[in-house]
Amino acid sequence: MIDRTALLLVLAAVGLGCTPPGETVPSDLPRTVAVLEPSNHTGDPLLVAGTSFLERYALRTERVTVPDVLASEARLQLERRGFTAVPPETVEGATEGRAPGSTDSAVAIARHGGLVGLVLWIDVRRWEPDAPTLPTFVIVGLTAELIDSTSGLVRWRAERRPAPVATPGEVNLGDAYLNAARKVMAELLAPLGPER
């Protein structure tokens, strides 16, 4: 029994040591970033607010989606790390509200809209709550790329493989989605520098 436990511990240590390191952040990154509208490849609209009959018609709540929240959180996290985020109105006008579906389309949209420098493209691949009410976690899988819109080169890339994000105490999906989006963007953009 002891030999089997020791073998499992050794295999776990070796397995953890073989985890590939994340991409290093280039030291010469420009400090101004335009956050493009994130792509949603989940097949679900991922609504945070404006979903119920009451919200839509009585309260006239504007529709808010997970990609909207991710873009907002990305701007906030970038600013906390010393970057200047291009105002969302400027990006919205330049991109005409289009979300890119790939790195190439992100470059094309940025160039067409006259966005120079770096653009951040987020691709949401998986976003699934464990339950429709009282969700305790949301499984999130996405990638983020900082792309030089002039050269078309990806300067930095981060991937979050699908894994649960804890959302304890949240009663509805909208609040759980907000909580998960905040946590994921802080985690994903942390390599870009410490918060200031």
Model-assigned labels for residue ranges:
Residues 1-17:
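Sec-dependent bacterial lipoprotein signal peptides
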Residues 38-41, 123-128, 161:
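Generic short beta-strand segments
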Residues 55-60, 141, 147-195:
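Short secondary-structure boundary motifs at beta->alpha junctions and helix caps
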Residues 63-71, 99-103, 133-137, 170-181:
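Solvent-exposed, acidic/flexible segments
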